[in-house]
């Protein structure tokens, strides 16, 4: 919802800069595919602000399932500054998993929200802020979510087997001051890490 803070020109400039840098970007209705040694990952994007809002993403997810081996859904939605996810958001995320999502990650609330595993699939309801210059009072906690996959290919069929071999959470502080160039910083103190996780 902030992609047009600087108007259409700002949005298009950002897309062009990402393209020049070779960084993939996504938006509602645009599936991004990445292929590594024949293994294809699809990234599906969408917005969810109320019950049933995942329906548009289900169309993209169906296409992604037909054209890739692993599907990541990244959604934007939910109530801001609330640490608990809403029942409707949980139901929508479960629906995405039921329709083939292999990982579901959320954003928008500006705060961390819980994670859960549903039918073997990890759902991260909100990663909070990461790089944020919108105001000087964001929640100062965020994390990097790192999911490790082991992929094996069947020599006879060529098909892939994917195993989730672990999740690493890297707690970070969010900084909004220009002196730090708005860059997040990894939390090194073990006690402080526990406050985030």
For the regions a language model picked out, list residue spans one by one.
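Acidic, metal/ion-coordinating pockets
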Residues: 1-197
């Amino acid at each position: 919802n902030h992609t047009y803070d600087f108007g259409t020109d700002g949005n298009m400039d950002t897309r062009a800069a990402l393209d020049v840098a070779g960084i993939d970007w996504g938006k509602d209705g645009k599936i991004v595919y990445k292929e590594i040694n024949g293994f294809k990952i699809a990234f599906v994007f969408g917005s969810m602000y109320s019950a049933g809002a995942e329906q548009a993403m289900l169309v993209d997810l169906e296409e992604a399932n037909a054209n890739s081996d692993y599907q990541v859904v990244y959604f934007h939605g939910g109530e801001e500054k609330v640490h608990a996810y809403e029942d409707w958001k949980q139901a929508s995320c479960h629906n995405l998993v039921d329709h083939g999502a292999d990982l579901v990650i959320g954003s928008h609330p500006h705060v961390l929200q819980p994670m859960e595993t549903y039918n073997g699939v990890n759902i991260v309801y909100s990663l909070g802020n990461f790089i944020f210059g919108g105001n000087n009072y964001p929640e100062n906690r965020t994390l990097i979510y790192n999911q490790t996959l082991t992929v094996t290919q069947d020599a006879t069929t060529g098909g892939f087997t994917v195993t989730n071999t672990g999740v690493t959470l890297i707690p970070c502080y969010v900084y909004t001051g220009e002196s730090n160039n708005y860059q997040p910083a990894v939390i090194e103190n073990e006690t402080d890490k526990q406050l985030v996780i």
